[in-house]
Amino acid sequence: MKTLFVLRISTVILVVLVIQKSYADILECDYFDTVDISAAQKLQNGSYLFEGLLVPAILTGEYDFRILPDDSKQKVASHIRGCVCKLKPCVRFCCPHDHIMDNGVCNDNMSEEELTELDPFLNVTLDDGSVSRRHFKNELIVQWDLPMPCDGMFYLDNREEQDQYTLFENGTFFRHFDRVTLSKREYCLQHLTFADGNATSIRIAPHNCLIVPSITGQTVVMITSLICMVLTIAVYLFVKKLQNLHGKCFICYMVCLFMGYLFLLFDLWQISISFCKPAGVLGYFFVMAAFLWLSVISLHLWNTFRGSSHKASRFFSEHRFLAYNTYAWGMSMVLTGITVLADNVVEDQDWNPRVGEEGHCWIYTQAWSAMLYFYGPMVFLIAFNITMFILTARRIIGVKKDIQNFAHRQERKQKLNSDKQTYTFFLRLFIIMGLSWSLEIGSYISQSNQTWANVFLVADYLNWSQGIIIFILFILKRSTLRLLQESIRGEGEEVDNSEEEISLENTRFDRNVLS
């Protein structure tokens, strides 16, 4: 019995020792405060002499793994590490101390000429708040064998006001422009070549991981918006009374908006990366088509109140929807064709739309070429819509006055009120859509200013919410819900295909306008 007890105790002790050896090699020491000291001199008492620093045995351990920045473990050859950063301040390098960084890649040993150009000093902020200028190799321990923080990195040039930073004695790093504090697993330093006029210099520069904004909020809003777009289209297809010319144009607009936002969502999730350029072209086509259909709606509203009794106008009225389709889809194809042609022919990057470049399956919106191919047409169409809505408002006021001089005033007044409601709802649509896209243009113009970029983030969320806003405006209003209930009960299935025109010579009463 005693033998069995001793055996169990021995087993427990062995397991504890194995676990401690594997998972707690150096007690109370962060892996990112250690360096590989396998090549250092080992003393009889188990201590190591590393770069003139005595590392006691209690601060050493044998590792057969390395910890990656995401806290996962990667199997490596067994080696000895020392918690030297507890004994002397460390500086976290991306590569060996005599290598130079070039486009995020570590290059081999620097030449003698490069070594003479190197500025080896760093400004280190001490615990008492004072700043000390220290030689990176003679006064600090260089940690160069830690895993790279990430694949994509950018460097900071502290000669620029927006690239200022503070390096602390304990290894933490403070980035000034967004006031973010980084640990040693999130940044690294390395020698980098800088242009100084006609000459070059080599200095130690911090490299940070590319800032990838969280897409959770955008994803939730865009998915909700897309669902609302589908519901809006479904209601307009289901309720026959909504399928007059206004309704048909509105359905086309919603389909274009849905497809454009779907490709934006694919780009956000990087689903379209395998067919990036075609996805960017299709997304551009549908967004431009959405703007053109919005201009069709504003033009049709103006034409509705303008009215005409000419034979040519009546002939056009019978084929108006076909004409609108030809204009909207045709102009979208023309704009897309010009963009694709420029993308393949224009060599100057300042004039090339650069579809599918810089990691985004869309037109490159960080350059001024976007104003020519994307925001320019957008500004023109917004200006056109504003003009049409102003002219329509003036016509409504004029018709309202003229009605007083004709017989059947009550019928004409009802017709005018119905069309006014249609105008009001589409005016709201344009104000919201036009405002959101106008803010988007403002965001594009001020993108180099971080403060204004944060302000215009509101515009982004407003843009992503367009489907939700349209659903509330057009579906959740009382008259549409009433028509939906009637359609579900099988009532009011007739569609009035007559044109919704206000003409002083020939006015027809139409109950089926969207109201």
From Swiss-Prot:
GO terms for cellular component: plasma membrane. Changing V345L: In strain: GA2.1S. Disulfide bonds join C29-C83, C85-C90, C94-C188, C95-C106, C150-C209. Changing E491V: In strain: HFL4.1S. It is a multi-pass membrane protein. One of its GO terms (biological process) is cell surface receptor signaling pathway. This is G-protein coupled receptor Mth. Involved in biological aging and stress response. Essential for adult survival. Gene3D superfamilies: 2.30.160.11, Methuselah ectodomain, domain 2, Rhodopsin 7-helix transmembrane proteins. It comes from Drosophila simulans (Fruit fly).
